[in-house]
Amino acid sequence: MRLSRYFLPVMKETPADAQIISHKLMLRAGMIRQTAAGIYAWLPLGLRVLRRIEKIIREEQARAGALELLMPTLQTADLWRESGRYDAYGPEMLRIKDRHNRELLYGPTNEEMITALIRDNLQSYRDLPRIFYHIQWKFRDEVRPRFGVMRGREFLMKDAYSFDIDETAGRHNYNRMFVAYLNSFSRLGLRAIPMQADTGPIGGDLSHEFIVLAPNGESDVFYHSNWEQPTRHIEADFDDPKALQSIVNDHISDYAATDEKRDPLREAQAGDKLRQSRGIEVGHIFFFGTKYSKPMGFTLPGPDGKPIPIQMGSYGIGISRLLGAIIEASHDDNGIIWPEAVAPYHVGLINLRIDDENCRAIADSLYQRLEAAGIDTLYDDRNERGGAKFATMDLIGLPWQVVIGPKGAEKGVVELKNRASGEKQTISVEDAFNLLTAGHQQR
């Protein structure tokens, strides 16, 4: 994409109402613009990152055996009255009436809807187990929306729901999602630590939240130094309950807790390996058994023909929030540093002198070759000062920058910069092309 044809309204100054780094950088990098309190329009650069995050999450959900569907944003109040949560949920739920005076709500969560949907379309215990998920925008009327997409009123969520005939099978599906979340966050370039959590209004007796360490996190977290080791993708047989349980056990054996769940005994055992930091919740999973199936009459005939209440779990990832968390965990004084897996473009190509015929010929040719090789490239072909072009590329955080200037063009060389390390090297155009395409083929 040529930057001269792109919509990238970068800002030199940070708006006064932006308090945390992710909010500041998303505004300055032209990723979002606020349209109302806690509600944002996603501009082309921000939307590309959202889509890349969605793709990874979809792949890991499918690997764990989940099926994608899509539920509407509007729900009937009657569904929530079935579960008993309509009056209990509070003012965060936006309630409306249609022209026929029917009560509706803008879904803050989907347990009731998915329960009714699956209840009315399964016939027997042989139809289980099942995991369904969807990715949809939600609305919660936060009393004080702040911190940009980290605590907005409208946000994009991935919600999954599991359905099982007994608790043993239900915990197997819980472990499927536990491992799928570890792999999702690892692929996104994040170290997410699973921590035992309260179930809150969702309910149930088993819950973990996944916390990303970040200096500007929203809460204190305490953890064993083993969690500072590099993350890795977990090769798992999702159909093997014992193997999955072993993986889960390995990942909860080292101490990690939020401030509310601290354990003085385990902290004493950790000794000088105990660490304290700030963290951001990016995922939350629950196993709540029959909390929704019983009041909503969701039973299926078991092997003996007798009705059995269905065991359920729910599993959420805040996708728009996750984007903010990635920035909080990966930035410097000059801007964002995107992990390669989610970067909106892989390469930022800078032509320092568009009026120089040699520069333009080399830049145009390299741009066309990179695009043909499947390398997403943002080509800065604007008639701007070099300093402004460098600042823009550092701000938006693309993994690689290729700089073409008049002196280098005469010699057939370019400057290649790695955004994360800051390392620069002067190499031939051909070597730069080979390096960038080789890295693409390895991913």
Swiss-Prot record:
- Protein location: Cytoplasm
GO CC aspect terms: cytosol
Alphabetically, the GO molecular function entries are: ATP binding; proline-tRNA ligase activity
Looking up InterPro entries in the UniProt record yields: aa-tRNA-synt_IIb, aa-tRNA-synth_II, aa-tRNA-synth_II/BPL/LPL, Anticodon-bd, Anticodon-bd_dom_sf, Pro-tRNA-ligase_IIa, Pro-tRNA-synth_IIa_bac-type, Pro-tRNA_synthetase
Keyword Iron-sulfur listed: no
**Mind listing the UniProt keywords for this protein, alphabetically?**
Aminoacyl-tRNA synthetase, ATP-binding, Cytoplasm, Ligase, Nucleotide-binding, Protein biosynthesis
- Lineage top rank: taxon: Bacteria
CDD domains per UniProt: ProRS_anticodon_short (cd00861), ProRS_core_prok (cd00779)
Any one Pfam family here would be: tRNA-synt_2b
**Reactions mediated catalytically:** tRNA(Pro) + L-proline + ATP = L-prolyl-tRNA(Pro) + AMP + diphosphate
User: What does the record give as EC number?
Assistant: 6.1.1.15
Q: What class of enzyme is it?
A: ligase
Instruction: Kindly indicate whether the keyword Chloroplast belongs to this entry.
Output: no
Q: What does this protein do?
A: Catalyzes the attachment of proline to tRNA(Pro) in a two-step reaction: proline is first activated by ATP to form Pro-AMP and then transferred to the acceptor end of tRNA(Pro).
HAMAP family membership:
Pro_tRNA_synth_type2
Under the subunit heading, UniProt states: Homodimer.
Give the protein name, as stated in the record. Answer: Proline--tRNA ligase
Species per Swiss-Prot/TrEMBL record: Zymomonas mobilis subsp. mobilis (strain ATCC 10988 / DSM 424 / LMG 404 / NCIMB 8938 / NRRL B-806 / ZM1)
